[in-house]
């Protein structure tokens, strides 16, 4: 009998950023105005020189303007904007230059601390440059000496933005037009880490001296309850504690609180910078060793080492009067202090699934 061979998974498919979509739709609309040519697809050049073709959903004249739209294709990345209609409207200006406007579903910057000034449409620098370069090349080819006004829109963008970090960063009214390479890499962490850095920058620039980096909603709720911190001072770090700690070398906020579930804090205590289960695991024998340091007998150490979960290990220690939660937080604190500058005061909280505090260290 022939042995069956396991089917190999297909490679994940990359997509294109909102910045690439805005570039393609702006180019198509401007081309219609300057040449009368109505395209079904356009070629754009990405920042590293790769040329890609993007299909258009429409390209049409509306009075003195033209608009073109495309569907955002994020490939196999679980991007909140995947499948959204992004469209740009272009108007010709008498004077040279390119102006950008936040249309429907695109946000506006309302707080200092980001790369864009307050009041600017949330169209990031690389997409602006991509759009400007493509429109300037078109203008040169057509002998056009005037300028362009580009309004970028995302259908449903105001609702989609509520699923992003934009409201917390002070980007209101819609999404940001993003991208540095023009390409969306499936399951890339770059965008999430960038939002963590932006959150710290915005809090710091707006004068907040105490921020809390939290692994999830329960830990954020705990920090609101304990310290009454506003949204701007709460950093949703998820599993990327390393992104927080390393960024504080550049932006040394005076006081940092780290808060997360006991299992994740135990990973931090063991020196892990990425707390996701793909990249780090809970070391139960290490927990047993820390319990031994604060008085656990051999039987309890064995029980902790053989526990099914970190929560069970914590419960076993608690029943024996061993403050394992505090011990784990103390080790997490020591590791965090080894990464951040000395002037940053760090404290650590561990919580259970209900948001109850099961350990703390360094608390003022």
Curated annotation (Swiss-Prot):
Belongs to the CbiD family. Pathway: Cofactor biosynthesis; adenosylcobalamin biosynthesis; cob(II)yrinate a,c-diamide from sirohydrochlorin (anaerobic route): step 6/10. One of its GO terms (molecular function) is cobalt-precorrin-5B C1-methyltransferase activity. This is Cobalt-precorrin-5B C(1)-methyltransferase. Its EC number is 2.1.1.195. GO terms for biological process: anaerobic cobalamin biosynthetic process; methylation. Keywords: Cobalamin biosynthesis, Methyltransferase, S-adenosyl-L-methionine, Transferase. The gene is cbiD. It catalyses: Co-precorrin-5B + S-adenosyl-L-methionine = Co-precorrin-6A + S-adenosyl-L-homocysteine. It comes from the Bacteria. It comes from Pseudomonas putida (strain ATCC 700007 / DSM 6899 / JCM 31910 / BCRC 17059 / LMG 24140 / F1).
């Amino acid at each position: 009998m022939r042995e069956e061979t396991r089917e190999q998974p297909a490679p994940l498919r990359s997509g294109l950023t909102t910045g690439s979509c805005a570039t393609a739709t702006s180019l198509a609309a401007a081309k219609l105005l300057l040449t009368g040519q109505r395209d079904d697809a356009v070629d754009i050049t990405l920042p590293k020189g790769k040329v890609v073709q993007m299909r258009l959903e429409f390209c049409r004249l509306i009075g003195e303007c033209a608009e073109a739209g495309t569907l955002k294709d994020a490939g196999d990345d679980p991007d909140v904007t995947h499948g959204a209609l992004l469209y740009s409207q272009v108007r010709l200006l008498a004077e040279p230059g390119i102006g950008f406007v936040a249309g429907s579903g695109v946000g506006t910057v309302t707080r200092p601390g980001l790369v864009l000034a307050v009041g600017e449409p949330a169209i990031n620098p690389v997409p602006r440059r991509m759009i400007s370069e493509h429109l300037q090349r078109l203008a040169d080819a057509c002998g056009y000496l005037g300028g362009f006004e580009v309004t970028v829109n995302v259908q449903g963008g105001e609702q989609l933005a509520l699923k992003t970090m934009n409201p917390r960063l002070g980007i209101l009214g819609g999404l940001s037009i993003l991208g540095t390479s023009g390409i969306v890499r499936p399951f890339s962490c770059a965008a999430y880490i960038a939002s963590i850095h932006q959150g710290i920058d915005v809090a710091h620039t707006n004068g907040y001296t105490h921020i809390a980096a939290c692994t999830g909603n329960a830990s954020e709720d705990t920090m609101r309850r304990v310290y009454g911190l506003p949204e701007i001072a709460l950093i949703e770090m998820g599993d990327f504690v390393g992104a927080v700690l390393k960024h504080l070398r550049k932006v040394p906020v005076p006081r940092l609180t780290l808060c997360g579930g006991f299992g994740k804090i135990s990973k931090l205590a063991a020196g892990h910078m990425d707390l996701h289960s793909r990249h780090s695991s809970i070391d139960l024998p290490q927990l047993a060793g820390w319990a031994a340091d604060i008085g656990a007998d051999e039987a309890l150490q064995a029980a902790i080492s053989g526990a099914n979960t970190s929560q069970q290990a914590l419960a076993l220690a608690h029943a024996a009067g061993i403050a394992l939660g505090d011990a784990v937080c103390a080790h997490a604190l020591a590791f965090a202090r080894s990464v951040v500058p000395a002037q940053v005061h760090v404290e650590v909280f561990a919580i259970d699934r209900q948001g109850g505090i099961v350990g703390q260290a360094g608390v003022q």
